[in-house]
């Protein structure tokens, strides 16, 4: 008689190399705060009472700005056919951002070419499985959305230049990063070649959007 076979579930190896190191590298994002102006102003009753008392009973109203909540991170995966093999990496990235605790919310979106060839987004890697919306939905004038685009930078949106224009549009409002899954030796063969350098944060409250790149000699 043959021996009984007992199936065992073995966790798959992570796709992202050194996830703990990646988490540590992302910790500075915990200090990110949107630089937008307050959306509205309300009366600060406590400060008004204290100021009025110091003024001898003359009412001296004090107002304070009310801002939106903490920043969110939106992870946007290029859904071109060459990116299908990186689906699990995208899921792992979501877990890392959720565990980081730096953002109020972690939003996952997929980038597709629209009927006119431009950028559209949806909640599914299959363009037919969920409604397609204009990529303008990724923009937030309050600056509270940090964007991470996951792409090999070789699909149709990169060949047409639409992806580059989307990055430029988003980077005017808040930090944007591209996570390139291909080996570094292949980066300059893509539609988004790189220049090595040092990234420095700008000074003051708007520093997160005033990044300076100094090229390596």
Which residues make up each language-model segment?
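Short acidic, S/G/P-rich loop/turn micro-motifs used as interaction or catalytic elements
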Residues: 80-84, 115-116, 152-159, 183-186
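Short, flexible loop/turn elements at secondary-structure junctions
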Residues: 53, 77-81, 112
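Hydrophobic beta-strand segments of well-ordered beta-sheets in folded domains
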Residues: 73-75, 106, 144-151, 173-180
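Hydrophobic, Leu/Ile/Phe/Ala-enriched alpha-helical segments that form helix-helix packing faces
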Residues: 29, 33, 52-53, 93-101, ...
